[in-house]
Regions:
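N-terminal beta1-alpha1 ligand-phosphate binding loop
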Residues: 3-25
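Short, well-structured alpha-helical segments in soluble
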Residues: 51-66, 157-171
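Periplasmic-binding protein-like
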Residues: 5-6, 68-74, 171-179
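Short, flexible loop segments at boundaries between secondary-structure elements
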Residues: 198-217
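Glycine/small-residue-rich loop that forms an oxyanion/phosphate-binding "nest" at active or ligand-binding sites
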Residues: 54-107, 111
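Active-site rim beta-loop-alpha module in soluble metabolic enzymes
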Residues: 117-178
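Short, structured coil segments at secondary-structure junctions
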Residues: 28, 86-89, 105, 134, ...
Length: 227
């Protein structure tokens, strides 16, 4: 099985981190092809970045026609509908994957994301997926996406602080990491706080493996039809 994991921004260091997270959970016989867009924004933070990254994302998908599934490694689920229309293999965004994983193991969950301007888009997605009632809050750390690549201890401190606030005030039962740039923190944070911490990259790879194993592909009747 070959899974294409696409980072829709152009920051290769984030793609490297995403690749490590994907390969850590993939089956031994699964090949992970990790790549990023060649054109577009360096990070995706809010509605404008979401819109401007889609042409580069679609171009990158077209460069990899021989894959069995696609994971779009942006927590906004950028371009998922467009890519599902373009291809027939299963396509999953890491936001949708993480929300569903959290809903399966906890009665309620919170999302820890980057900038405040990203919050409305994530809340819109939760409503669209029918999971808004299970998410008690989407919390912003006000950390720019690219700051996650610097390894600054202050960045990790802010993420941990929001998790503590969520546990105390939101009474959350699980934490969803709301950015692919946080993928490397899942195990560390889960162990420290003693509750499930979900990374969408890991969840996305695991879910698309299951879809391929069950011989399920994107429906071409209705919304994702090109006819």
């Amino acid at each position: 099985m070959k899974i294409l994991v696409i980072n829709p921004n152009t920051t290769s260091s984030m793609t490297d981190k995403i690749a490590i997270a994907a390969r850590a959970v993939a089956r031994p016989d699964t090949e992970i092809v990790a790549t990023n867009s060649q054109d577009g924004p360096a990070s995706i933070q809010g509605f404008l970045d979401v819109a401007t990254c889609i042409p580069g994302l679609l171009a990158e998908v077209s460069r990899h026609p021989d894959v069995d599934a696609i994971v779009i490694a942006c927590f906004d689920d950028t371009g998922v509908d467009a890519v599902r229309t373009l291809v027939s293999v299963p396509v999953l965004g890491i936001g949708e994957a993480a929300y569903h994983a959290a809903s399966m193991i906890a009665n309620k969950f919170s999302v820890i994301t980057t900038l405040s301007r990203s919050v409305p888009g994530l809340e819109n997605n939760l409503m669209r997926y029918g999971l808004a009632q299970k998410c008690v809050r989407v919390r912003a750390t006000d950390i720019p996406v690219l700051k996650l690549e610097e390894g600054d201890p202050a960045t990790l401190f802010k993420i941990k602080s929001e998790i503590r606030e969520s546990i105390v005030h939101d009474k959350t039962e699980a934490i969803v990491l709301g950015c692919a740039g946080m993928a490397d923190l899942m195990a560390q944070l889960s162990e420290e706080f003693g509750l499930p911490v979900i990374d969408g990259v890991a969840a996305g790879v695991t879910f698309v493996e299951a879809l391929v194993n069950n011989r399920l592909s994107t429906s071409k009747i209705g919304a994702y039809s090109r006819n």
